[in-house]
Curated annotation (Swiss-Prot):
It is found in: Cytoplasm. This is Fuctinin-2. To human SET/PHAPII protein. It comes from Rattus norvegicus (Rat). Residues 1-22 are annotated as: Disordered.
Length: 22
């Protein structure tokens, strides 16, 4: 979890990481 990121930004980052795994 990166500090300084908005909550929505954090959720998008997690979604992007899951896409990269697939």
């Amino acid at each position: 979890e990166l500090p300084g990121l908005p909550k929505g930004e954090k959720e998008q980052q997690e979604a992007i990481e899951h896409i990269d795994e697939v």
